[in-house]
Amino acid sequence: MASEFSKKRKLKDAKIATEDGAATDKKTKKVKKDKKEKKAAEEVVEDATPEEENDAQKAEEQQDGDEVIPTGNGDKEDSDDKDAEAGDELTKTNDSLIAPSIATNATDFSELNLSDKTMKAIAEMGFTKMTEIQRRGIPPLLAGKDVLGAAKTGSGKTLAFLIPAIEMLSSLRFKPRNGTGAIVVTPTRELALQIFGVARELMKNHSQTYGVVIGGANRRAEAEKLGKGVNLLIATPGRLLDHLQNTPFVFKNMRSLIIDEADRILEIGFEDEMRQIIKILPKEDRQTMLFSATQTTKVEDLARISLRPGPLYVNVDEEKQFSTVEGLDQGYVVVDADKRFLLLFSFLKKMQKKKVIVFFSSCNSVKYYSELLQYIDLQVLDLHGKQKQQKRTNTFFEFCNAKQGTLICTDVAARGLDIPAVDWIVQFDPPDDPRDYIHRVGRTARGNNTKGRSLLFLQPNELGFLAHLKAAKVPVVEYDFPKSKILNVQSQLEKLIGQNYYLNQSAKDGYRSYLHAYASHSLRSVFDIHKLDLVKVAKSFGFSTPPRVDITLASSMSRDKKQTSRRAYGSQPKQNRH
């Protein structure tokens, strides 16, 4: 397709998940890259819910067979009697990495007494001033304290936890043979890849190794990398637990555990996995950093079992007037169901020179509207959980690198991802609750002194959601779109769907999934499926009359039941155990 998103572009960043990422110094020989790491990821049907990810991993393990996995004692050039001594030194080193004289009111990175290698990388990334979470979080973390951080997405917390972890690895002179010294646990694969990319930039001048293990990627290649020694490891919970239990690699020297987006990790059902991970990992001399946008009971429980007594609590949001970031203009538009797509189409036509993200409630809706928009010559990228992992990775980095264009997606992209210079966030389908709204709009106006705009589509029967936003301290104003500016292509749309078999089938799937998602909404007092005008809803999918869907079945399905019922492609149902 002819657009800014050139398919011929070589997306170097998209391959980061399959590269070892080790920057070696002059005294260390380079480790050869395993060709298997370049294979495309296994197909995964939905986002990484615990049951699905575990099933997928079991299927991959069966395919791996009885392969001999290397031990985690590392490089051949270091195969001398100093290996054991190095391990002892690591366990005896003082936790404090900075001198007590560092000013706690530092505002510039240059005031932190960081290593020259880290400072050079930070300068090359274009950072000089610290954000509030960095200013308040990095000094105590460098001093070895446990930190419980509360900060909005886009606040700069990735650097806040990576810099202390990298400085620790550098200070202790970690080598591959010393194994894993720091682990970052994050809820989604895309966020793990993004953190990996930031780590790669920060560690370009260091000799320590780094890597990522995520569901949907080649497990065998990951195991081989871990066996060689990965000093900084970024991981999703299910895959990390799998490797901790089944892959021989060195993690006895681990000094730093970082749990990012803890509330989201728990929301999608990884509570049991996190408890097991924390139980397996070494506790002695371990520093833990836990970051969460919201402080729920489950997050407090996780903090209690993972953090040492008396952690430092850093909340950069408690004094803020609003829950969303500054520099973000937020609005909503009231539109009947049958005019929703017409308004979206008109809006995207006008915004083709801007960078726009549009959120939908289901994978099938994303798939259908992506196919439809491209069929009528409005080029978009799409990102959802039914895509292969490699496709999701490529799409994410392609949109990151683009200066303009439209990405339509599900909430797989709504949390934590740092997509540069997004002008508009459009919530075509309503979020599940105000927290999801905040995470979605967090894709724009990220960092200091940045601007962005958001638009929420609401039907007349959904205006009760505004009260929930107000209670969550989210300021929104009503936007008015003149009817004369809305392109009326309804008759052409219905004709197209009636004549094109494949679009027709895709439209039916999208319509069905939209209703099922709507029926499983957590705010059912506001988003009541029985108040929907199905004729008008069907028109937004290009139907003159509604396709048949079992609404009773849909409304009986809860979001949790739907998530836990999903299985990975090719996996088998779990058998009863006696």
Curated annotation (Swiss-Prot):
Region (Disordered), start-end ranges: 1-91, 556-578
Catalytic activity field: ATP + H2O = ADP + phosphate + H(+)
Motif residue range(s): DEAD box: 260-263
Key words of the record: ATP-binding, Helicase, Hydrolase, Nucleotide-binding, Nucleus, Ribosome biogenesis, RNA-binding, rRNA processing
Residues in Helicase C-terminal domain copies: 343-497
Enzyme class, spelled out: hydrolase
Residues making up the signal peptide according to the UniProt record: none
Motif window: Q motif: 107-135
Any GO CC annotation of this UniProt entry: preribosome, large subunit precursor
Pfam families membership: CTE_SPB4, DEAD, Helicase_C
UniProt xrefs under InterPro entries: DDX18/Has1_DEADc, DEAD/DEAH_box_helicase_dom, Helicase_ATP-bd, Helicase_C-like, P-loop_NTPase, RNA-helicase_DEAD-box_CS, RNA_helicase_DEAD_Q_motif, SPB4-like_CTE
EC number(s) per entry: 3.6.4.13
Subunit structure: Associates in the nucleolus with the 60S and pre-60S ribosomal subunits.
Domain remark in the UniProt entry: The Q motif is unique to and characteristic of the DEAD box family of RNA helicases and controls ATP binding and hydrolysis.
Family under the similarity heading: Belongs to the DEAD box helicase family. DDX18/HAS1 subfamily.
PANTHER family, A to Z: RNA HELICASE
Record protein name field: ATP-dependent RNA helicase has-1
Gene name tied to this protein: has-1
